[in-house]
């Protein structure tokens, strides 16, 4: 459903949820509906109070409200979308032949670069422009950067002339790379491992990136934070499908990942979770809920 419709429903004072089942197959045999099945009731004569944030668990609602009161910035503020990296016009100045190249798709000859995607680092761009602008080794004397993506179903980094990649806030910073499609959206599941992006490395649309750090240590600390149960519990409030878009990170608080943080990042993931529980003043019941509903990541 459209975002505007969802927001309208969540802020409707006359709407309430009567029933929710996350596993749609329990309601409709052999049917997988991402996000589950919900039955709502609307009474225009009665005010029920706006839902605002919907979760299947009452304890999770109280956790969200506690954390929200202390959130100054959200992790979504430093999440960069799959489409955030772009080509420059210079690539086509140096390689005008790309615009006239074709390929066979579903038995038809089509342009190599799809209409409207001239500057996009699409998920299959390595296969399309391999040994044209993307290479396994540096070419010539021009300065190169690396792009992280997939080629022949494997994660790889390929070199490209720096002048062919548009300026980006985290290209020359440390960051994390996550697949743009990750997991199923089931609450508490384990996430696919992230990769630390070094300085001078960007990504194709197969990935999102998080952070623009001056030090590698900050990226490592973020990586540890995202293995924490509390962070993932808050992520899966909005991440109800495999889609790993920027907006689903809204309720995950941004932390200070430097050595000056109020969190001791040298500790284990489990010990960091305990620090976070204290920071957000969670009760024993709230902690038990997270510990029993969110799978461990070491």
Language-model segment annotations:
Residues 1-26, 39-42, 222:
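Conserved Class I SAM-dependent methyltransferase catalytic core
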Residues 31-204, 211-263, 267-284:
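C-terminal substrate-recognition regions of SAM-dependent nucleic acid methyltransferases
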Residues 285-298:
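Short, amphipathic C-terminal "tail helix"
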